Amino acid sequence: MACNYLRPGASFGLNLLVVVLLVLAVSPRAQAQQAESAARLAPLTDQIRLGAEYFLNRTDTAESVRHHFQLMHKYGLTIARVFIIWDDIERERDQWDLHRYDWIYDAAQESDIKIAATLCAEDPPGWMKLTPFYHHRMNLNDPKLRERSAIYIEKVVGRYRNHPAQGPWLLMNEPALQVNYERTTMEAFGKWLQERYGSVDRLNQRWFQPLQNFSDVQVSPEQWIPGWTDYYSFIDWKEFNIDNLCDGLRWIEQQVRALDTTHPTHINPSGLTHNLPAAGTDLWKESAIVDFLGASIHPQWLFSEFEPSDFGLWFAYCLDLLRSAAGTRPWWVTELGGGPTIYSAGVRPMNPGKSELARWLWDAFGAGARGVVFWLWNPRVLGNEAGEVALVSLDGDPSPRVVAVKEIADTLNRLPELAQAKAVAPRVAILYDREALLLIGLDGRAQAAAKRAQEPLWSLEGTFAALHRMHVPIDFTDIQELKTGAAQRYDVLYLPYSYALDDQAVQALREYVRKGGTLWADGLAAWKNEYGEVRPRIPGGLGDVFGADTSDIYPVEKPYSVTAANEQAEELWRLPLELKGAQVLVRDREGQPFAVRHQYGKGQAIYFGTALTLGYFRRNNGQVQKWIVEPALAANAGMPVKLEKGSGQISFRALEGPGRAFAVLSNWGQAETVVVSFTGDYAKVVNALSGAAMKLTRATGKTVVTVPLQADAVLVLEAQKP
């Protein structure tokens, strides 16, 4: 059943005003910090860069290093990422030797390449006898480790801060800290609890095991084994681990900044298709620590649960999640698998070909990335990834992958205008509900075999898939952005499986709709707060906003269709909605409300009483997709660059720059004919990859191009003003 989903009085101008007001609200100190950060970034992000990790093997020589950097320069790379492994430079206590890394920096300078230096301050050397090998993160809460780490940072940053080849400092590779229950970590946890609760009495009103003092806290994983569990201590511990990682990163950043105020800082979180909060990662919090954000996106490892035909979809998901957390600042794809995986990739061994590399790279550039760095240039000679993932061949000669990358580097050099363009701002966002993603770690345990703990994540991904396949530009927004009112810049906000939301978030949603936003939700929206305390009705505290609610839940063992189309829309639950002013959009086969719409204030709220987005993730049904995307399509109608016709196998991106607009299409399916429109009167549109002029038509204020798109191909259209 179709309905007019565009909210009453919808106005892009209003959203622009919201953005302006948010910018004006930034404090003078924050503005000064942003200006300093922008100055550090400018020399590095003034162009779109390609790069690769250079791994310093112990068999390397000064001459072999120089040869590799000459090849990198020849094939268009301007960034070389390097791990400055602590054990490499301090094999014995206080015996520091960096001469082999000097080879790298000097070779980079000769080849006009910037070094992205990865610090390893959390990864102590072998002589300390704390780890069995490198890449084993240790506890940065330990003051003894921090003391040695500070010396390591001073030796590295102090040596290279004035080197002409120095680029950004990566504070930590794929940031994560060892989850531990050591005394120093408990001391940090006690201080965190004191900041959260203020008094022990307040904490003791919640925790099962009372404390005399915050400093007495001691937890262990045995407290949260399956069965009856103290939810309060579990959620506090999980939130602490997120903040504890941020504190460790912040400490490293402070050590770097005390030595070097010139070069930017960077990090590359990983696992973007996984439950990040459950693993101790908050992209938005980590992004705030550094000058610019990046991520590791390895299809070979990250997409093992997906079909290769959907790799483009999930690569796009990672890009949009990364871009959203980066905000208005530049961002990179800091690791992208560049070569064969034989043993290291588990169930997905592969070797990306020319067309795959092209689609990944152009989709990243179309999404707004200022750089893509491959993992890696040259193969390791020993270890878990020995002989794998490299761009060059095993003997060090350029492979067909290197040649393919050079073609793209040459195209970027011919298209300086692309570096001046920015991705078109989405009008649609999905709430990345950290609180639901944490709470499900407890709620989902009892049915682990059914992977219940994955449901909020899969619903989030299902929402993205439904929208991306309809070529709707998408942002993600987090809980804190929601609470500050930043979500008001979006016409439509999606809440997939957001069954846990704190009281402030619920109130922020109310304000979002009251001020003119369209809120779309499904399932047990806001049923619980962040600790798992249930609210008496669903949607929790928002019945007047949605114009319907319920106090009962009917679990559904198997998917159930509500229409004659056999769409299997009902998933997990059927909610007996009680109408309180809402308009019924869809009724089930028994005539009961299945989906409702309600005007509240200047906006509207749409609600489906089942886990609709989870069902779409699992079955990719067209009718279910339509129910999800209708409000987004209405909001997307006036976008300046649109894919008017094209299948869901196309990843579509739009950018605008001075006097130009770009459309980037990456086809992960069969050959087809596509139609792209540019709002306004453009003098010509060219295929930016071939230089060929496109035939134009004009209709209702748009410049329209119809063009064939080959299977597994990339099309970049550049529209030029007169």
List each model region and its residues.
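Short, acidic/polar
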Residues: 59-74, 149-155, 275-286, 353-361, ...
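A conserved amphipathic helix/loop scaffold
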Residues: 496-722
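Hydrophobic targeting/anchoring helices
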Residues: 266-269, 273-462, 548, 552-566, ...
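N-terminal carbohydrate-binding accessory modules
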Residues: 32-79, 91, 106, 110, ...
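The substrate-binding groove and active-site-proximal loops of carbohydrate-active enzymes
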Residues: 50-60, 83-99, 132-150, 172-179, ...
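Aromatic- and acidic-residue-enriched carbohydrate-binding clefts of CAZyme catalytic domains
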Residues: 43-49, 74, 83, 92-95, ...
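Polysaccharide-binding and catalytic clefts of secreted carbohydrate-active enzymes
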Residues: 137-155, 159-313, 321
